[in-house]
């Protein structure tokens, strides 16, 4: 399926359950390994990425296919010193999260979502954005590097990356 059979829309409060679903999809599982239990979504360190979606500073987009099914998402949310995300850099830099359903990967959708998010962040005057990625997730790493993300540190086994928006 090509990009022209998709459209991208803003993520609203009513999308919280889909964003939770995407949070689960975003957990990187190396080839041949057991996927995480869905219970992980109830853990505070996961929940905080989408809980009460639509609060101040939240910005996100959802890709919807020709049949109206949401197939991917990209979000940013602010965290603070007392409640850090995995890709936390500072209170004034939002953290990006994105995921696509497996059948929607490798079709340019990640690039389209990223372009839309960067456009939205520029409009809001956001200057920098961070994220956390598993180093083995080479497809994601390549996409992030194309958008100017650079490694700034490690958090556990994941790489923290930072990009200039403006």
Where are these regions (language model features)?
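A short, polar/charged loop-to-alpha-helix boundary motif
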Residues: 80-89
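A short helix-loop-beta-strand connector motif used in the catalytic cores of GNAT acetyltransferases and
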Residues: 47-62
């Amino acid at each position: 399926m090509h990009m022209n059979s998709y459209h991208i829309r803003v993520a609203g409060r009513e999308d919280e359950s889909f964003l939770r679903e995407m949070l689960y999809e975003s957990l990187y599982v190396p080839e041949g390994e057991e996927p995480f239990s869905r219970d992980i979504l109830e853990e505070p360190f996961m929940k905080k990425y989408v809980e009460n979606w639509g609060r101040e500073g939240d910005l996100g987009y959802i890709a919807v296919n020709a049949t109206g099914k949401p197939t991917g998402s990209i979000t940013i949310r602010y965290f603070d010193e007392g409640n850090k995300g995995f890709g936390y850099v500072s209170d004034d830099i939002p953290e990006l999260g994105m995921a696509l359903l497996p059948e929607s990967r490798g079709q340019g959708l990640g690039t389209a979502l990223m372009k839309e998010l960067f456009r939205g962040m520029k409009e809001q005057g956001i200057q920098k954005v961070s994220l956390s990625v598993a180093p083995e997730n080479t497809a994601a790493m390549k996409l992030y590097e194309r958008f100017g993300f650079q490694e700034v540190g490690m958090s556990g086994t994941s790489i923290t990356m930072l990009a200039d928006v403006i």
